[in-house]
Amino acid sequence: MLKFFLPFLLIILFLLTLFIIWRINARKYVTSDTVASAYDAWTQDKLLERLWGEHIHLGFYPTRKKYIDFRKAKVQFVHELVKWSGLDKLPKGSRILDVGCGIGGSSRILAKYYGFNVTGITISPAQVKRARELTPSGLNCNFQVMDALDLKFEDGSFDAIWSVEAGAHMNDKAKFVDEMLRNLRPGGYLALADWNSRDLRAYPPSFLEKLVLKQLLEQWVHPNFISINDFSNILRINKNSAGKVISENWNSYTNPSWYESIIEGIRRPYSILSLGPAAIVKSIREIPTIILMNWSFRKGLMEFGVYKCRG
């Protein structure tokens, strides 16, 4: 009896240990400094880049395609958002601001394939350093450390504003929108993608959903989530907006990214193993949050919103 009970007990203890590590090392949002610290750590330990590549965002999976490489899907996402938002109508040399640029993946595509002059900003000094390292000389990209809630550019400095999965880290969504649209020239383009919750006033979360949302907020430095409709309204009523906002839910295109991000560690085990035991623990530690994200987006508790409007 003992020989059957002991392995079971060891498994329980292992899972309990992982749960304790997961909870103790939660990354709760306190101020924007906690966002900067989290992304500094994620960049410096190299694990996220090894697994996700140069793009720290979800991929785009056309519904008729059975399989697309995880990293290629991320590149595809950038091109799809460019086309959907109308940025491809802008002439070469147009000035683009990439808000929450990460390590510069989107910025480099916008510069290389569309001929744009791109400025990327992120609150993480480590991300700026890495973005500069990854950017070939001669490519029209520059990267700066800057808070998206306090942009240091003159009004109307850019022909387009681009932002992917940054807004969920902003505690003041209206200020986030105001800063972006203030820096957009009249008639310019805004292209934005972000993680949203469903409308929790119209469809209140169950007890289980509340627990899940709490973990999604606390694990990856998110102060709050709002619905696609609420964010669209913030864009619509802003004094610098032309007023017409188009939004869509891209859950069906992006959902495969979640389980693909786990499978990626199996496809490229050396990318984790080469970083040592600490990286293995860190990668395992993220799996529960990814599973909860996958569940939330598939159940409709969370929604992947894309937005476009003009200045």
Outline where the language-model segments fall.
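N-terminal auxiliary segments of SAM/dcSAM-dependent transferases
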Residues: 4-49
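Conserved alpha-helix/loop element of class I SAM-dependent methyltransferases that forms part
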Residues: 71-92
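Class I SAM-dependent methyltransferase SAM/SAH-binding core
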Residues: 95-97, 103-150
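A short acidic, Gly/Pro-enriched loop at the edge of an enzyme's catalytic core
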Residues: 149-161
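A short SAM/SAH-binding and catalytic strip from SAM-dependent methyltransferases
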Residues: 160-172
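A short glycine-rich, Lys/Arg-flanked "PGG" loop and its adjoining helix->strand segment in the class I
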Residues: 174-189
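Acidic carboxylate diad motif detector
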Residues: 192-194
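Substrate-binding/catalytic lobe of Class I Rossmann-like enzymes that use SAM or dcSAM, i.e.
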Residues: 204-206, 211-301
